[in-house]
Regions:
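Non-ligating segments of multi-cofactor redox enzymes
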Residues: 1-144
């Protein structure tokens, strides 16, 4: 998840785009599997799906959002979308919720009182490949 995602620019069919809230998503029905986005992503965040769906469509939860409740067909690209079906309902992404050590954090960086804003203010924070200008939304920190 980048503020200026190179993957969006290279998709020839606009199957990947940035939502108004900044989340980069993929529509698996539009994706033609050209893998241009995989080549453009400097973080290796894109994955090509070599397998057929493991879960039949009828087993999917009908209460989830359109972009997050789709069987990922063989031959399309996939990526993390911060579990937008969860975050838009006020929940944490699944990886944050189940992290056994609590080391994953998620929140509104624009809210100065949020946990993530406090971490950025008080910890030694860095982002990967900052020099590329993609402005990734993943921050890494450690205590000093």
């Amino acid at each position: 998840q980048c503020r200026t995602p190179p993957c969006v620019k290279v998709c020839p069919v606009e199957a990947t785009w940035q939502e108004k809230d900044g989340i980069v998503v993929v529509d698996y029905n539009w994706c033609i599997g050209c893998r241009y986005c995989e080549a453009a992503c400097p973080y290796w965040a894109r994955r090509f799906n070599f397998k057929k769906p493991g879960l039949p469509s009828e087993d999917l939860n009908p209460d989830m959002g359109y972009l997050s409740n789709r069987p990922r067909e063989n031959g399309v690209m996939e990526k993390c979308h911060f579990c937008l079906h969860r975050t838009r309902a006020g929940r944490y992404p699944a990886c944050v919720e189940v992290c056994p050590t609590g080391s994953r954090k998620f929140g509104n960086i624009l809210d100065p009182d949020s946990e993530i804003s406090n971490i950025i203010r008080t910890k030694r924070v860095y982002v990967l490949k900052e020099e590329l200008g993609t402005s990734p939304k993943f921050y890494y920190y450690f205590n000093v």
